[in-house]
């Protein structure tokens, strides 16, 4: 089976594929200081628990220090297996129609490939993670750029940190947009404000594009808020891993 690894700022998601079929998946906390040996032993433990036999590995990361450890881990623990890390020089088939292609994160590239392959374009991917990333894909499958916004958990943390009379509260949907106490008022403003922000950014993007085939939600925090977002058309929690599989097939 192919092992795909997506290392984000907060979480690392792994999945195994048998051909096009996703068979197993795991989500663990990202530690940018993890050594190659720690990663190797952890991944081997996860795979052994489900009796998974790996025949190849594909990886991408937005965390440079973690990516170096992954590269060393692959060479040390899987030296005989074909493996691929999404980085400049890897064939993705995605044209980057932006000012500086070197600035584009690997996750955004593989999201573009998977979304265009599955849904066509124009399309928009909203990745709900530590940050909220909006990725715009043309009708020809080009990556056109997008937008960044704070993630919902960052927004909750920032308000508590900067407002003396307010404390940190759980990032969750309140019972009403009209809060009856301090906690509910915080949750109402942040939660519904965040959902409204997502919808407005997507609406403005659609206005510029003219029309879209799909608006895809992904990322670990997507389930928290997508029911309140009126512009989301599909939820694909594994879109990055699916894209990794597609890039691997193009290169190995």
UniProtKB/Swiss-Prot annotation:
Pathway: Cofactor biosynthesis; coenzyme A biosynthesis; CoA from (R)-pantothenate: step 1/5. The active site is at residue 107. ATP binds at residues 6-13, 130. It comes from the Bacteria. A monovalent cation. Ammonium or potassium. Keywords: ATP-binding, Coenzyme A biosynthesis, Cytoplasm, Kinase, Metal-binding, Nucleotide-binding, Potassium, Transferase. InterPro entries: ATPase_NBD, Type_III_PanK. Its EC number is 2.7.1.33. GO terms for cellular component: cytoplasm. Pfam families: Pan_kinase (PF03309). It is found in: Cytoplasm. Substrate binds at residues 105-108, 182. The keyword Membrane does not apply. It is an enzyme of class 2 (transferase). K(+) binds at residue 127. One of its GO terms (molecular function) is pantothenate kinase activity. It catalyses: (R)-pantothenate + ATP = (R)-4'-phosphopantothenate + ADP + H(+). Catalyzes the phosphorylation of pantothenate (Pan), the first step in CoA biosynthesis. Belongs to the type III pantothenate kinase family. Homodimer. This is Type III pantothenate kinase.
């Amino acid at each position: 089976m192919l092992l795909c690894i997506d290392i984000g700022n907060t979480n690392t998601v792994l999945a195994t594929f048998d051909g096009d079929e996703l068979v197993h998946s795991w989500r663990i906390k990202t530690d940018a200081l993890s050594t190659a040996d720690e990663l190797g032993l952890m991944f081997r433990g996860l795979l052994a628990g489900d009796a998974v036999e790996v025949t190849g590995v594909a990886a991408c990361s937005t965390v440079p220090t973690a990516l170096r450890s992954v590269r060393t881990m692959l060479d040390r623990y899987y030296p005989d297996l074909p493996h691929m890390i999404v980085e400049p020089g890897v064939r993705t088939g995605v044209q980057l129609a932006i000012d500086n292609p070197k600035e584009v994160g690997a996750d955004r590239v593989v999201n573009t490939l998977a979304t265009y392959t599955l849904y066509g374009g124009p399309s928009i991917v909203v990745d709900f993670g530590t940050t909220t990333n909006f990725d715009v894909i043309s009708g020809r499958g080009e990556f056109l750029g997008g937008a960044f916004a704070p993630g919902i958990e960052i927004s909750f943390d920032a308000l508590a940190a900067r407002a003396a009379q307010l404390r940190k509260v759980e990032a969750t949907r309140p019972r009403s947009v009209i809060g009856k106490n301090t906690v509910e008022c915080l949750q109402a403003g942040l939660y519904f404000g965040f959902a409204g922000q997502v919808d407005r950014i997507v609406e403005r993007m659609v206005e510029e594009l003219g029309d879209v085939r799909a608006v895809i939600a992904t990322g670990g925090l997507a389930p928290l808020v997508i029911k309140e977002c009126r512009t989301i058309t599909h939820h694909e929690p594994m879109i990055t891993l699916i894209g990794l599989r597609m890039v691997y097939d193009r290169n190995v």
